[in-house]
Amino acid sequence: MREHQRICILRMLDQVPDYSMNESMIADELGRWALACSRDQLKSLLAWLAEQGLITCEPIGHSQIARITQRGQDVANGLALVPGVKRPSAVR
């Protein structure tokens, strides 16, 4: 399920106008896609994506803002593959 959550996060970030979302918004969106997780699990997902260079995370108080990188956009759009991230389907 982590692979699905990771690609979902990347696709969400790729589709918003400023390519960034706060942790709470990401949690809500994952829930809408039946991929809900605990806040600790979400922090781990975001940290893993940041370690892979797919997003950057900026701490804001007790939360953080995630922003997709160019590499993350390539993965979200199926132009690059990263082990641990589900390959996106051809249909969006």
Regions found by a protein language model. Name each.
Residues 1-20, 36:
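Short alpha-helical segments that sit at the start of domains
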Residues 19-30:
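Short acidic, hydrophobic short linear motifs in intrinsically disordered regions
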Residues 36-51:
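Short amphipathic alpha-helical interaction segments
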Residues 50-60:
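A short, conserved structural fragment
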Residues 62-68:
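Minor-groove-contacting beta-hairpin "wing" of winged helix-turn-helix DNA-binding domains
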Residues 70-92:
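Short, amphipathic alpha-helical interaction segments positioned at domain boundaries
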